[in-house]
Swiss-Prot record:
Swiss-Prot/TrEMBL catalytic activity: a plastoquinone + NADH + (n+1) H(+)(in) = a plastoquinol + NAD(+) + n H(+)(out); a plastoquinone + NADPH + (n+1) H(+)(in) = a plastoquinol + NADP(+) + n H(+)(out)
Gene Ontology CC annotations of this record: chloroplast thylakoid membrane
EC number, UniProt record: 7.1.1.-
Gene: ndhJ
GO terms for MF: NADH dehydrogenase (ubiquinone) activity; quinone binding
Descriptive protein name: NAD(P)H-quinone oxidoreductase subunit J, chloroplastic
Subunit structure: NDH is composed of at least 16 different subunits, 5 of which are encoded in the nucleus.
Subcellular localization, as worded in the UniProt entry: Plastid, Chloroplast thylakoid membrane
InterPro entries for the chain: NADH_DH_suC (IPR010218), NADH_quin_OxRdtase_su_C/D-like (IPR037232), NADH_UbQ_OxRdtase_30kDa_su (IPR001268)
Membrane topology per record: Peripheral membrane protein
Broad class of enzyme this protein falls into: translocase
The keyword NAD belongs to this UniProt entry's keyword annotation: yes
Role description: NDH shuttles electrons from NAD(P)H:plastoquinone, via FMN and iron-sulfur (Fe-S) centers, to quinones in the photosynthetic chain and possibly in a chloroplast respiratory chain. The immediate electron acceptor for the enzyme in this species is believed to be plastoquinone. Couples the redox reaction to proton translocation, and thus conserves the redox energy in a proton gradient.
GO biological process: photosynthesis, light reaction
Length: 158
C-alpha cells in the first residue's frame, strides 16, 4: 500500500521503495544514496520544511548501516502536519550519503553525530568531524561489531 507521498513520487518518476507505515501512520520510504540529495530538495520544495530528526543505526553486525530522516510538512492553520520517514541504507565498507545540510540546516550536528558514532560520511557537509569522541578515537562506537580498545568489564564479586 502506497501513501500520498509515495504515490506523488511515483507519478513524477522518482525512484524509491515504500516500507509501509509506522504505528502512527507515518509513511517510511527507502531512498538510494545517489538519489537522496535531489529527492531531499524536491521534498523541501513540496513543503517538507522541517527536519524533525536525523539518526543512524547499524542494521546487523557486518551488514548495512542506515541513516534515517524524519521530515514534517508544517503549514499555517494545519493541526496535524504531514510527516514522512526516509531511510537510506549503505554498505559499511564505504558508508557515504550526500549531506542535506544545505537543504535543512538542522542536519548539521545530527549528521556529525552519525559520523562520529557509526562512521557514515555525509558528502559536502561543511564541518564533518567527531563531536562526541576525541579526534584520535579509533573506530565507530555504535557499530554492532565494534570492540572497545583497552576495555575490561568490571564485575561485582557477589
Amino acid at each position: 500500500m502506497q501513501g500520498r507521498l509515495s504515490s506523488w513520487l511515483v507519478k513524477h518518476g522518482l525512484i524509491h521503495r515504500s516500507l509501509g507505515f509506522d504505528y502512527l501512520g507515518v509513511e517510511t520510504l527507502q531512498i538510494k544514496p545517489e538519489d537522496w540529495h535531489s529527492i531531499a530538495v524536491i521534498l523541501y520544495v513540496y513543503g517538507y520544511n522541517y527536519l524533525r530528526s536525523q539518526c543512524a543505526y547499524d542494521v546487523a553486525p557486518g551488514g548495512l548501516l542506515a541513516s534515517v530522516y524524519h521530515l514534517t510538512r508544517i503549514e499555517y492553520g494545519i493541526n496535524q502536519p504531514e510527516e514522512v520517514c526516509i531511510k537510506i541504507f549503505v554498505s559499511r565498507k564505504n558508508p557515504r550519503i550526500p549531506s542535506i545540510f544545505w537543504v535543512w540546516k538542522s542536519a548539521d550536528f545530527q549528521e556529525q553525530e552519525s559520523y562520529d558514532m557509526l562512521g557514515i560520511s555525509y558528502d559536502s557537509h561543511p564541518r564533518l568531524r567527531r563531536i562526541l569522541m576525541p579526534e584520535n578515537w579509533i573506530g565507530w562506537p555504535l557499530r554492532k561489531d565494534y570492540i572497545a580498545p583497552n576495555f575490561y568489564e568490571i564485575q561485582d564479586a557477589h
